[in-house]
Amino acid sequence: MNQIRLFAQSALVSVMGMGMVFAFLLLLICVVRCVGALVSSFGWDRGPDEGVGAAVPAGGALAAAIAVAVHEKARSTS
């Protein structure tokens, strides 16, 4: 009976940890998109001779790099 309780507590802590990581990544993606929209609205992502924005791909690359780092950290601690 004690082993079942320990397993249930461990599973609950794991699910809560994954939920916290998911919420952090979701919040991070929202912040990066908002910053990208702000940069695009002010025109800071365009050079003098460029017609295409660069903030959105850069924000996506940043979000992907942070997601990989968080995933590696979570994998190394478990």
Curated annotation (Swiss-Prot):
Among the entry's GO cellular component annotations, what is one?
A: plasma membrane
What GO biological process terms does the UniProt entry carry, in alphabetical order?
sodium ion export across plasma membrane
Membrane topology classification: Multi-pass membrane protein
Keyword terms of this UniProt record: Cell membrane, Membrane, Transmembrane, Transmembrane helix
Question: Which NCBIfam families does this one have?
Answer: oadG_fam
Q: Which InterPro entries match?
A: Na_pump_deCOase
Source species, domain of life: Bacteria
Instruction: Report the transmembrane regions from the record.
Output: 12-32, 51-71
Q: Give the molecular function GO annotations.
A: sodium ion transmembrane transporter activity
Q: Where in the cell is it found?
A: Cell membrane
Q: Which Pfam families match?
A: OAD_gamma
- What is the protein name given in its UniProt record? Uncharacterized protein TP_0055
The organism of origin for this protein: Treponema pallidum (strain Nichols)
